[in-house]
A protein has these predicted regions:
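Bacterial Sec-dependent N-terminal signal peptides
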Residues: 19-46
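N-terminal catalytic cores of secreted or lumenal carbohydrate-active enzymes
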Residues: 63-246, 266, 272, 276
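Bacterial N-terminal signal peptides
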Residues: 10-20
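Charge-rich, low-complexity intrinsically disordered segments
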Residues: 234, 257-260
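Short, conserved phosphate-binding/catalytic loop or strand-edge motifs used
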Residues: 251-257
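N-terminal zymogen propeptides
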Residues: 43-74
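Short glycine/threonine-rich loop-to-helix capping motif typified by GTGT followed
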Residues: 259-267
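Bacterial N-terminal signal peptides that target proteins for export
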Residues: 2-10
């Protein structure tokens, strides 16, 4: 997409960050003590072993603790890998979590002081882990309140995305939580990826261009590549107006997964011309 200097990044996998709301007598009213360990530190495994935790579907084992021997010669390849710390190749820019409607909904059920303490522990570079990335969806995802895009109804022929509008998931939950996180870590990099394009942009196949009125599967209609690119830019600009700067976008979440709750099949042969649009 030839718009400003926004980077397009392809992510093979994403980590979903969800905070589970637990029912208890004090629920979300009491502050969370993040400093006092609940148990004594685990003992260091015996030299040459690794600690294991096993859970089986039949319930016989549930986080059963054990040890596994390392480098005992059994089933080991005859090749030795040596690490040279002086040789450096690609670098890792950072690590992060997905910020979804469900996680933000649960966070907003918490006492504000407890929520602030939790977010500081995760995102603060001085008082916490210093998590440097957050991923949000461009439209709905697995953890949204429902299926939607930001332009479910096609606009005019001259401006097909004239009906673009953020959904309540973003306005009432994701954006407020992102602002809280950014107040803790202003250098946080936010990336976005769509699960699906608007349904009116979908076709069953790119040759016949038969319409595909479905949240799952389907292809991006080649006729709408430029329109969909403008949809991305519109999202970036609208989020900026709301105080959220998008660092990078990915063309498609799980591009080969046709069966997700919302999905768009986008193999590289179709993704490449879209990125160039």
């Amino acid at each position: 997409m030839k718009y400003h200097n926004h980077k397009i990044m392809m992510f093979i996998c994403a980590t979903a960050f969800s905070v589970t709301a637990c029912s208890s007598s004090n629920s979300f009213s009491d502050p969370i003590d993040f400093e006092t360990p609940s148990e004594a530190p685990n003992p260091i495994p015996t030299q040459g072993t690794a600690k294991t935790f096993t859970t089986t579907a039949d319930g016989i084992y549930s986080l059963a603790e054990g040890e596994a021997k390392l480098f005992d010669g059994v089933s080991m390849a005859p090749t030795t890998i040596e690490i040279d710390k002086n040789k450096k190749f690609q670098t890792i820019d950072g690590f992060g979590y997905a910020i979804t409607y469900s996680s933000c909904y649960n966070l907003m059920q918490m006492n504000p002081e407890a929520r602030q303490a939790l977010l500081k522990r995760i995102y603060s570079t001085t008082e916490g882990y210093g998590v440097s990335y957050a991923r949000i969806s461009l439209g709905c995802n697995d953890f949204s309140s429902t299926e939607y895009t930001y332009c479910d109804k096609k606009g005019s022929e001259n401006d097909p995305i004239s009906n673009f509008e953020l959904y309540s998931d973003e306005n009432n939950y994701v954006i407020p939580i992102l602002k809280e996180i950014l107040s803790i870590n202003p250098s946080l990099k936010i990336i976005a990826a769509p699960w699906t394009c608007p349904k009116w942009m979908k076709v069953a196949d790119i040759d016949t261009k038969t319409p595909k009125d479905s949240w799952t599967d389907g292809h991006l209609n080649p006729d709408y590549r430029e329109t969909y690119a403008k949809y991305f830019v519109k999202f970036i600009n609208v989020m900026k107006e709301k105080g959220i700067n998008i660092y990078a976008v990915s063309p498609q979440n799980e591009p080969l997964n046709k069966a997700n709750c919302a999905s768009l099949y986008m193999p590289w042969q179709e993704e490449a011309p879209f990125v160039k649009a």
